[in-house]
Amino acid sequence: MTATAEKTAGRVVRITGPVVDVEFPRGSVPELFNALHAEITFGALAKTLTLEVAQHLGDSLVRCISMQPTDGLVRGVEVTDTGASISVPVGDGVKGHVFNALGDCLDDPGYGKDFEHWSIHRKPPAFSDLEPRTEMLETGLKVVDLLTPYVRGGKIALFGGAGVGKTVLIQEMINRIARNFGGTSVFAGVGERTREGNDLWVELADANVLKDTALVFGQMDEPPGTRMRVALSALTMAEFFRDEQGQDVLLFIDNIFRFTQAGSEVSTLLGRMPSAVGYQPTLADEMGELQERITSTRGRSITSMQAVYVPADDYTDPAPATTFAHLDATTELSRAVFSKGIFPAVDPLASSSTILDPAIVGDEHYRVAQEVIRILQRYKDLQDIIAILGIDELSEEDKQLVNRARRIERFLSQNMMAAEQFTGQPGSTVPLKETIEAFDKLTKGEFDHLPEQAFFLIGGLDDLAKKAESLGAKL
């Protein structure tokens, strides 16, 4: 699906870090986003450098962003216009392998060269092709299914500062989707730690779900051009599974903030005037180009889960604030919840979903979720009084509510598949019906006699009965 044209050659006239200016013959200037190739030799190393056209400067000059380090590139080197934009391999063959933003296989060099290739710059589906129905994606995680239900074919964000469990929750979702639904997943590692990418590769192989997952990495040590394009490369692979094979695909992006950050670096390198807080003036446009392609078409979908790093825990920062506009559900991971040892460390009061509506999830689900939120909100309101005067100064009704809220908090925790090797406890999947039933009983006080510890890091009602019995209590 990539267009080809007669190849023309230019020469490098200026190099400033990852920014390269190339001069072409008059009338042969390459189009914006075209990929250019330069053959360079650096010591004993010979390699092909890929550049992407970012600006037309006039006088047959183009300004490009390099997708690899420019070590060894010198003025006067010949640069060839490929006549097409960067393209990546697509199809079933990409599953079980790791690729970079250019579509080169990292675990098996040379693999995938003969596959069908699609351009990473594509238009979103036409409005008439979009899926009009809204459907819930059941995950088996109690806190998610009850309070922030995910939309099939929607965009879900995991917000949180550093070290609160965003990557672990993404690994958990890959595990659950592969084991419980047998779906295809595509993982985009955008500007994150190389160590985490290696850990994910090993864990997916150990869990026997690597065969259903394609991984595309552009990590922290890569130039900004690569980090800016790696999400588009992964999305292109996911679009093939959706459009050509009619599959429901899960796209994981870790971390969408690094996509914005790379765009900011590229914008500065290109000499654009910075916008608010130093971000690029095209921030909303670049985010929209990515997010609009992540959608459901009739009968098939791409559901995306995006980790969003929040700089200094500031939610008014333009990067997370711009992401908010595109989301169907937000799961906020909180340091306060994390410090209590509750995992996943989801803040139920700060998280939200557009489909927590009786018309979509049903009256009973909505009623139970709202009652849980009411109890937790009241508990939060009472925290100052408890801290100053102590719990004994509360009314009997409030004491009962506080005890119930503490049980709800602990019951929202769950043993996870991604943490099995650390906890020694198998991960649990709780059906939505059982989750609603359990929390309905909990809010009505049917479990008030059970010790708080019985609710901690367990699955459903069967687990609760076993834990309670081990602590000398009965349901």
From Swiss-Prot:
Catalytic activity of the protein: ATP + H2O + 4 H(+)(in) = ADP + phosphate + 5 H(+)(out)
Subcellular location: Cell membrane
Keyword Cell membrane in annotation: yes
Sorted UniProt keywords: ATP synthesis, ATP-binding, Cell membrane, CF(1), Hydrogen ion transport, Ion transport, Membrane, Nucleotide-binding, Translocase, Transport
An MF annotation (GO) of this entry: proton-transporting ATP synthase activity, rotational mechanism
Annotated Gene Ontology cellular component terms: plasma membrane; proton-transporting ATP synthase complex
Residues that hold ATP according to the record: G160, G161, A162, G163, V164, G165, K166, T167
Membrane topology qualifier: Peripheral membrane protein
Role summary: Produces ATP from ADP in the presence of a proton gradient across the membrane. The catalytic sites are hosted primarily by the beta subunits.
Primary localization class, coarse: membrane
EC number in record: 7.1.2.2
Source superkingdom: Bacteria
PROSITE patterns reported in the protein's UniProt record: ATPASE_ALPHA_BETA
Coiled-coil segments: none
InterPro entries in UniProt: AAA+_ATPase, ATP-synt_VA_C, ATP_synth_F1_bsu, ATPase_a/bsu_AS, ATPase_alpha/beta_chains, ATPase_F1/V1/A1_a/bsu_N, ATPase_F1/V1/A1_a/bsu_N_sf, ATPase_F1/V1/A1_a/bsu_nucl-bd
This protein's record includes keyword Zinc-finger: no
Assembly description: F-type ATPases have 2 components, CF(1) - the catalytic core - and CF(0) - the membrane proton channel. CF(1) has five subunits: alpha(3), beta(3), gamma(1), delta(1), epsilon(1). CF(0) has three main subunits: a(1), b(2) and c(9-12). The alpha and beta chains form an alternating ring which encloses part of the gamma chain. CF(1) is attached to CF(0) by a central stalk formed by the gamma and epsilon chains, while a peripheral stalk is formed by the delta and b chains.
Origin organism lineage: Bacteria, Bacillati, Actinomycetota, Actinomycetes, Mycobacteriales
Family stated for the protein in its record: Belongs to the ATPase alpha/beta chains family.
Protein name: ATP synthase subunit beta
SUPFAM superfamilies xrefs: C-terminal domain of alpha and beta subunits of F1 ATP synthase, N-terminal domain of alpha and beta subunits of F1 ATP synthase, P-loop containing nucleoside triphosphate hydrolases
Organism: Mycolicibacterium smegmatis (strain ATCC 700084 / mc(2)155) (Mycobacterium smegmatis)
